[in-house]
Each structure stands twice: as structure tokens, then as C-alpha cells.
């Protein structure tokens, strides 16, 4: 009976378990299904010893009067029926201490007993070979134990009521499958990792819900392809990123039932020649349906071309707009991945040149947009970009339409030709400058692709001293927005990308804006403007990086981790410009007010020091006597000023005084270690990647590191173990090295100096990282969070006061209305009472006899006398 009951419980547990389906990997699915047959949670071992052995032992009636020492105890009757044999100690007829029991059906137990129950450490073996070794609590496997199946499968971990519950590790005996993580009621539930092969190259780490992948997780396949994101019902579902290392592809976006569906970004990485550099990679950003590009989307080609429009099943279909690598644009209908009206686009180039102005005017009128928004060249060459008459070739097409419109029509052709020659003479140097600045802060790229952003371009402008021509970077942004039709919200965006041809166009436009008055009476004017800019600004100063952001590679990688939050703070405290186009800008005055609101202006960071930091790289801020706080700051200047503040101030005191403020949301840990910065700000550890907090790190939109091209993982992870070492550990590791040849170097004065300087550099970097963390996380970000909370509270109070005022007004109006009703009722009541009073009053006698003449006065007196005399007589 016992054996049958145990087997029934065990079979019921097997039937309740459903093997995990791994639809994304057939070979792993076979292994997991096979393993799931072994991953049965043994049913709770409930030996039949429990109830009978708890009963009080009987006494023979014949020995009722015997002494207590002579009392005889008998083993419970039911125990004799269940236990075939027992070897061990007994106390009062109950099993006690260590013993060995053989049950009906062949099950055995060897271990500790207490009051007749299996209690403590023991080993229970079923007749079919299943074995449990571990803790027992009153006949039930509890706490920690090890299950071993006949085929060699094992489980070691926490056990509750005989089932796997808590943290434990399972290994399959027939397949190289293992799981380590959390369990609930015998099923994988919570955080856990499963490995599908012996080499550990195929695995899943993340969330489980009763044997089903659900939540956040990372799946690495045997091929090396890896997915990181959300799961639902064992399939990729939600936001996630898939990297196909076998085909050099990557998709980041929305998934449905294991397939790309929704908005996402698909990137194709190209194999590049070593030490080469390219500006772009093939990339699609838009809508997906069942894994196909379908709907609205943009495709960026590695050559520099770009298509934006409608897609149907991976093909261009419907209305779209394609920009070729030379800058030419076609906008119209597409069919079956080709232009629908190809012949209409093949217009003669010379004919289009003669009618450039007419075509441009008609196209602008047809679209009904402004000149700045539709300034793209409308004169098309052959659609493959051939037959270029530009001296720069078909790969680069300068956009000079608006600049040439500033000159007489008869001199435009000469101006264009001369400036193209000037660019051609400097194209090698300009390419080198573009590559240099676009690679700033970029540690690694899979395909040597570096793309300049506005942040890099601002650094180039400041290094070349463009702002010394009495024009700020914010003014330059506005000038470029007029020539290039940049949307208002992106005029000062640091993440806007800049291609090489756009970079050249920007230089020509700024050269004209800065020097056109000087050469307006000379020809070719545009050529002279550009030549002077190259000679005075670019050639002498380019690639000599200044400032606090890009001056050192390692520090740049650390600093980039705070750029997203700083951009959020920057935009929050910008105000609309007073002049068109009324975009949001940051003035020095607003910056200082912001720091004052954050309680960061103190003895360490005074207003004078603030002004001097800003004036380091700008000659128009401070002239020794007066300061210009109306100067506009772009985000680069804002962020570099913050980096400088983190270096020039004593942040221990600042943080200590700041934390004394009654802020509930300020972090309690004042000093961030290097390891804290590495773990929290730079990359996720495997365990952190599978936590719920990891969802904060993942976003369907690109982070600032992706936008700017910074990939800090490789170098920072290499430097992480170095930063964690102390000086003593370094010395110990050096002593462990082989003494052959190297011992002399370490013992030499030169070697000691080298190692000492190396340690000093590590300590210096460590201190800088700590200061950076304290300043940004513990001070700046906490102050911003508190300030935003105050603003929300003030707004909430204002809304509540408005609601209360409105309610009070409504109540007053209702009260006034009731009072008016009462007044009206009172007036009507008084009128009604007056009417009743008039009706009830009797008529007066004089009013009834108005015509009766009054009697003579004498008669009246006599009558009164005569009436009074009888009265007197009666009284007497």
C-alpha cells in the first residue's frame, strides 16, 4: 500500500509537469524535453508512521497498579503493518535516534528518528530507485536535500513539503542539460539559468513562470547568436535586441511571438578592411510586420544614400523619397522596389542646369513649403548618381543653391567652380579632420563605422576658434538651420548626425556668413571666404582637442555615462529665445540660477569661479572688468562646465553639506566607488541583466552612447580588474612573476619609477571617477530630482487651490441663490400678510358718515355733564 501510494503521488507530480518548449532552437528543445522527463518533483514523503506513532502507548489493565519504572510500552499496531523491519533505538515504544526502517513495498529509510517520526538528516529510497538525501521534518522532506533519479539526474537545493521550492540546481542524466535558479512547487519559477549543452554555449538566463520563459531574459544560441529582451510563453515577445553574429546583423525593437513585429531598427554590419573608417552602415528604422519591412520606414545605405517612405514585404512600394549618395533627391512613387516612373527622372543635366531656378520654383510651389524646408537640389542626374559634372566626383555633391542665390546670376557658375576647386585642394585634409573628430570618444566599432555628431562638430568649431569671430555656437546653429532646413527642436541637438558632404556644406555656409562682408566687392567671393577660413582657423588649430570632454579617451568614456541625464536637465532649464525661430536656449544667467536652485553655489563653487570656468574657452564672457551673462551656451559648453566643476571643487564638503539638507531622495551613500560606477553606469553584469531593474537599462530608442558612437564596454571591462586592485595586490602580483629577466627590471630604479608612476595614474583615475560619481549622482542628479519633486508639489498644490477656489465659488453662488430665494419668499410673505391685514380691519365711523355735520361745541359739553351727574349720584 505504501509503495503504491508513493508511486501514485510521484506519477501525479509527473503528469502535472509540462516540459518546457523551446521553439527558438530545435536542438535545444529536444534536450529540454528529454530533461523535463527527469525534472519531476518527488511527492512529499508522508510515511504512515505519522498518526499511529503519535498516540499515547497503552498499558495492560493487569498492571494498572505497577510502578512507573516497570511500565511496558508496545509499538503502535499500524506501525507493525507498515514497517516490515526496524533496526535502531526505541524510547517508550517509539523510534528514536538513528535507525534503519524497511517499509512495505520495498521503500527504505536510514537516518534520524524523533518520537517515532523521521526527523533530521536521513536517506529515503523508493523501490523504483529514486533517492532523497537531506533534511526531514516530521516525516516530510524539508529545507535542503538532494534527489537522485535512477537515470543519473540529480537535484540539490531547497525543498518544501517534498517538492523543489526555493533555490536549487538540477542536472539531467541523459542529456547535457542543467538548470540553476529558483523553483516553486517543483517547477522553474523566478530567476534562473538553463544550459542546453556541455560546453555552455547554448543557454538562457532570466525570468521563469512555472517552467515557461516569461519576463526579461537573455538567450544565447549554440551558433553564438544572442537575444536580450522580453519573453512570453517561451517566445521572444515585447521589447528586445537580437544579434546574429553569424550574419553580422542586429535588430532592436518590438517582437511578437518570436518574430519582429512593430517598430524597430535592423542593422547590417559590413566587414571592413583593418584600420579603415566608414561613415555609415546599412540600417533600417521603421515598421515591421511578421519579420518583413512593412509600412513607413527609413533605410540608410552604407554609401550615404537614404530612402524614406512606404514598404511592402521588404520592398519599396508606394510614395517615397530617395536621396542618392551625391545628395540628389527623387520624390515620387515606387513599385516593386523600383522607381515607378524611371524615364521621367532621366532628364538631361545641361537642360536642368539652364532651368534650375524654374524647376526649383515650381517644385516649391507644388509642395507649398518654405525655402528653408525644401532647399534640396531638385535637378536630378541619372538615378545611379553617374554623369557628375562636379569636380569633387559623384560621391560628394555640394549644396550651394542658397549661397549662390546671394550672387548675381552671371557670376554664379564661376563662384561654384572656384569654390569646388578650393574644396578639392583641401579634401584630403578635410576628410582627415572629419575622421578624427567623428572618432572622438569611440572605443570600438564592429565595422569601423564612425559618424560625426553635433557634439563632435561643436568641439571642432571651438578648437578652430570659429567663435572668436564674434559669433557664438548657438548663433552658428541658427545660421545652419536656415540654410539646411533643420527642425526647430533639433537646432541645438547634440545627437544630430553629420555626413561628410554635410560637414563640407556647413563649412562653406559658415565661411560665407563670417567673411562675406569683407569680400563682397571681390570675385570670386565665396572662394575667398572659404580660403581665409581654412588658412586662419582650420589649418592651424584643427585636431588640437581642448576642453574637458574629449581631451582624454578613458575619461571621455566615463563622462559619456552621464550625458543623457545632463541633456534632460539642460532642456528642462532652457527658455524660448526672444528672436526667431524662438527655439529653446540656455543662457549663462539661467545656468547660474539653476545651480543656485540646486544649492550648489557655495564657498567651493562661487559665482566668480562659475564665470571663470565658462570664460576659459570663450573670450567674450569676461574681459577682466565686466561679465556677459546673456551669452548663450550650447550643450557641449554646459556639459564641459559641469565636468570642470567636478574637478575644481572639494566635493566631499559639498556632498556632506548637501546631504545635511532635508532631502528625502538624496542617496545615503555619499561616496561612490570605482566599482559602483562601473557596475551601475557602464555595463550590466549577467545577474543584473536578468533582474527586473534591467528593464530600465533597455530602451527601444537608442541611448546617447549609441547616438554618439561610444562603445565603452570593451575597454572599461578590461580596465575594471585593474581598478579593483590595491597597491599591495599589485606588489604581490609582481612578486609572483618569474624572476628570469623581469626580476631585474622590477628591482631597478627605472622599473620602480615606472611602477610608481603607473600606480599614481591608477589612483588619480580612481579619485577622478569617485569625484565624478559624487558630483553627478549624489549632488547634481539628486538636486534635480528634488527640484522636480518640488515643482510637481507646487503644481499639485496650485491645482488643488484652484479646485478649492472653484468649489468655494460654486458654494458661494449656491448660497447666494438660496438667499435670493429666501428674500423673494420673505417679500411675498410680507405682501400676503399685508393684504390679509387690510381685509380684516373694521370700517371707521367717520368714514361711514362723512356728510353728517358736527354738533355744536356747547351741546357736546352739556351732554357730557348730564351723563356724568347720574354716576355721581349712584356712587353716593
Curated annotation (Swiss-Prot):
One of its GO terms (cellular component) is sperm flagellum. Keywords: Cell projection, Cilium, Coiled coil, Cytoplasm, Cytoskeleton, Flagellum, Repeat. Residues 752-841 form a coiled coil. MORN repeats lie at residues 86-108, 109-131, 132-154, 155-177, 179-201, 204-226, 227-249, 251-273, 284-306, 307-329. Residues 1-72, 360-386, 841-876 are annotated as: Disordered. The keyword RNA-binding does not apply. Residues 1-16, 57-66, 373-386 have a biased composition (Basic and acidic residues). It is found in: Cytoplasm, Cytoskeleton, Cilium axoneme; Cell projection, Cilium; Cell projection, Cilium, Flagellum. Pfam families: MORN. This is Radial spoke head 10 homolog B. May function as part of the axonemal radial spoke complex 3 (RS3). Radial spoke complexes are important for ciliary motility. Interacts with RSPH6A. Does not appear to be part of the axonemal radial spoke complexes 1 or 2. InterPro entries: MORN.
